[in-house]
A protein has these predicted regions:
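Generic structural marker for isolated residues within well-ordered, non-membrane alpha-helices
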Residues: 97
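A structural signal for small-residue-enriched, beta-sheet-centric alpha/beta enzyme cores
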Residues: 1-77, 81-92, 101-403
Length: 403
């Protein structure tokens, strides 16, 4: 259901949505840095946000919009996070709402704001204002790719996807763009992620669906264990598909939620694979746990371990680092019953390392995509966590990312 064929259409794949991305001069690189996503028809709105206590000004502003369950637009910039900027930062985030509202002909409270970039610097509001106005003039059904490129920072490419499903006899479309490469760990959405759909769904149910989906998708990524001040995932549903409005948790709701999950899991894998300096995409599959929470905790412990991540960069089948991370995760486990496999090859069982085919394991470790399977043999629950390795390039990228 995650369609690469429609990925370029992204957030403008659903009916009634337009987007644009332009160069406002906020990024030192001179690349695209202001994005606008718009629906003339009012949309139900939902969002999840960072749990970092040092939340950025745009997070505060956008939470208020999402609380109304309605919006018309998303405006976002890259190159400056507008975080730790005090009262002026709050005023600037509100000004972004007002500027966009004036240009679009909607109310400021209908505009969600996102920012990403360097912390502690005030937005260059003259550039931001001109950028928003220019982006509104450039809005089109072909603007999703530019919008996606306008929100990235250290990403090597923009992330996008789209899909469709039949709900209530109508084709319902979904689109997504996201940024995320470093400063990613769970506890909300972990990235800037903007989702659109032409489904007709109650705003409260939309929020419930998004919150559940995020827990099983974007919150299952870990690149470097850091949680940003600016993280948010937003979904707008404008009802243009004409499906019978989803007002209860029935079969239509479940279909909607499942499609949203597939979309978000697909984008999560793209984000993890594009970790800063990453050379490996690693899936940590924990099964045999007593609960999803336990499985996730163990998976995150392994995914967050610098020793595990550097071992995979070095293509070293160091199962000791993996079982060590399992052991200190805080989830009760029996090391004599737990098993570990790399690429389907058993490397640890019955409390000791196994005898394995070195050539076969070398093939696993030199591949780009690697699956680490951990079976706790203590229940029926499972979870998949997506991560990447730590390379020399990761240190270089972040060492050179100056304020």
């Amino acid at each position: 259901m995650f369609s690469e064929a429609n990925a370029k259409a992204g957030v403008t794949f659903p009916k009634g949505f337009q987007a644009a991305g332009i160069k406002a001069g906020i990024k030192k690189s001179g690349n695209l840095d202001v994005a606008v996503i718009y629906t003339e028809k009012e949309a139900a709105a939902a969002g999840t946000f960072t749990k970092n206590a040092v939340a950025a000004a745009p997070v505060h502003v956008s939470k208020k919009v999402v609380a109304t369950h309605a919006a018309h637009a998303i405006v976002a910039n890259a190159g400056c996070a507008n975080a730790c900027t005090g009262a002026q930062g709050e005023k600037d985030a509100a000004a972004m709402q007002q500027i966009a509202a004036n240009a679009l002909g909607c109310a400021p409270d209908d505009v969600i704001v996102g920012s990403t970039g360097i912390i502690g610097q005030l937005l260059p509001m003259d550039k931001v204002e001109q950028g928003i106005k220019a982006a509104v003039k450039e809005l089109s059904v072909d603007g999703s790719m530019d919008a996606g490129n306008a929100i990235i920072t250290t990403d090597t490419y923009s992330k996008a996807g789209a899909t469709s499903v039949t709900i209530g006899g109508k084709e319902v479309r979904f689109g997504i763009i996201a940024k995320g490469s470093g400063m990613i760990r769970p506890d909300m959405a972990t990235v800037l992620c903007f989702i659109t759909t032409d489904a007709d769904i109650d705003g409260v149910l939309l929020q419930e669906a998004l919150s559940e989906v995020i827990e099983h998708s974007l919150n299952m990524i870990s690149i470097d264990g850091d949680m940003s001040t600016n993280d948010m995932a937003i979904v707008l549903a404008n009802g243009a598909a004409g499906n019978p409005k989803i007002t209860e948790k029935n079969a239509d709701y479940e279909m909607f939620k499942e499609t949203l999950l597939v979309l978000c899991q697909g984008i999560s894998e793209k984000i993890a694979a594009d970790g800063e300096g990453a050379t490996k995409f690693i899936t940590v599959h924990v099964k045999g746990a007593k609960s999803f929470s336990d499985a996730k905790t163990v998976g995150m412990s392994v995914a967050n371990s610098p020793l595990v991540k550097t071992a995979f960069f070095g293509e070293d089948p160091n199962w000791g680092r993996v079982i060590c991370a399992v052991g200190y995760a805080g989830v009760p486990m029996d090391p004599n019953h737990t098993t570990v496999k790399f690429g389907g090859i058993p490397v640890y069982a019955d409390g000791v390392g196994t005898s394995y085919d070195a050539d076969a394991l070398r093939t696993v470790m030199t591949a780009h995509d690697i699956v680490v399977e951990i079976d706790l043999k203590d229940g029926d629950s499972e979870a998949k966590v997506w991560t990447c390795d730590f390379s020399y390039e990761y240190v270089k990228i972040n060492g050179e990312y100056h304020t």
